[in-house]
Amino acid sequence: MDPEMRAGTLLLAALLSAILLALAACSRNDDTAVPPPRSSITFLHYFTDSLSGGIDEMSQGFNNQHPALELKAISLDHEAFKTSIQDTLKTDNPPELYSYWAGARTASIVDELEPLDELWQQAGWDKAFAPSVIKAASEYRGKKYFLPLTQHYIAFFYNKKLFDQLQLQPPKTWEEFLAVCAALKARGITPIALGARDKWPAQFWFDYLLLRTAPYSFRQQLMSGEARFDDPQVRAVFARWKSLIDKGYFNSRPHPNELAWDSGANDMVFRGEAAMTLMGTWNLAYFSNNTHQWQAGKDFDFFPFPQIDPAIPTVALGPIDGIVMPKRAHDKAGAGTALRYLASAEAQRTFSRYSGALAPNLQVPDSAYSDIQRRVRKELERSPVFDFAFDLATPPPVAELGLDAFAEFLAFPDAYPEITRRLADEAAARFSATRAVKPAP
């Protein structure tokens, strides 16, 4: 080969190599190209600390299925959340979604929410949720605003090994309950742990003592301001509650107002210092977490609040958590996509698994639940009525008065006649003020 031909061949080879390298580089650039940014859907919620089970897993499930969207779940503790939602709802750039409590809490902010009726119909959610749940939790002023996410049940959670050791059976009547408490006290064990540092846990005692002794219609009247908190039926509740305190059936050191519901009261039950606590089914996740590793049905179990008056039909108590969309949300389409996923059986099954809650979605089968969750579901089915706890059943300004009154009562049980009189007067004024603010059409 002459020198010129050889030089040409080498040049051609060099050019081909350069082209191949360039193509390879382009290929590598294509492979490593930064994907377009995902649109963020902000979801502000209150599922924190001991109540956080399932929220991250559920959010991740959405993000895995929607590469163009990112559900950003941002948590605040309960009290901070109550303030934050009021402050941010009316701004020009609120989060796309909020968690919230069904009942009076949602009713109090409905003017700031986006109706979900069109999305509801498109998604066929009337088939996904029970009519009773839709009516109680989702509908306000004839429109749907609230997507149900969890349903919890308030019951006694007890140290089963301790009960078995002392040959005690879960009580079904008030007389049996008092006998169990007396037996525990005689053995030096605190019968009932109450951690009311955050105020709201004490309300369950007021609620159930009222619902087991007074007609359900009276409770509805009380929650709506048609009955007063110094009514004899209410005072009888405080008198019965006081008798339990006087007998030493609650923890006194630390005092309930100084004790957390989880690391305080629950852990007293876990350690065997107390036998039981009145709390929600989020305790299923708490007692079985990595720290405690209790097995439901073996180490701990639950029983319903005992019957007091056989003439009073059973009412089950608990919250329904869900999701609302503010009417000022910027990305309503993206928020709607997120709501479709969060309403699905897949998402609600995930949340139920980690939180201990029952899934409102009817398409979640019984096989998805643990044995204790299935038994909880049966208790709910046996109750003619399911209602929300005190602070979710009455307007927020009245609820705050009540929670303060319960805390004051725990500190000064003998003062309940004065506490109920003052609560009655202050609640009447709050109800009047609430009625004076006419809802927007």
Each model region followed by its residue ranges:
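Extracytoplasmic/periplasmic solute-binding protein
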Residues: 145-149, 154, 178-230
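Short, solvent-exposed loop/beta-turn-alpha elements that line the ligand-binding surface or hinge
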Residues: 118-131, 213-236, 290-295, 307-314
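A structural signal for short loop-to-beta-strand junctions that line the ligand-binding cleft
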Residues: 87, 95-96, 123-162, 190-194, ...
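Conserved N-terminal structural module of periplasmic/extracytoplasmic solute-binding proteins
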Residues: 23-106, 110, 121-127, 170, ...
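Conserved C-terminal helix/tail region of periplasmic/extracytoplasmic solute-binding proteins
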Residues: 27, 111, 164, 383-441
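Hinge/lid segment of periplasmic solute-binding proteins
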Residues: 102-155, 169, 178, 205, ...
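Glycine-centered hinge/linker elements that transmit conformational signals in sensory
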Residues: 183, 224-258, 305
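Extracytoplasmic/periplasmic substrate-recognition and gating elements
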Residues: 60, 247-250, 289-357
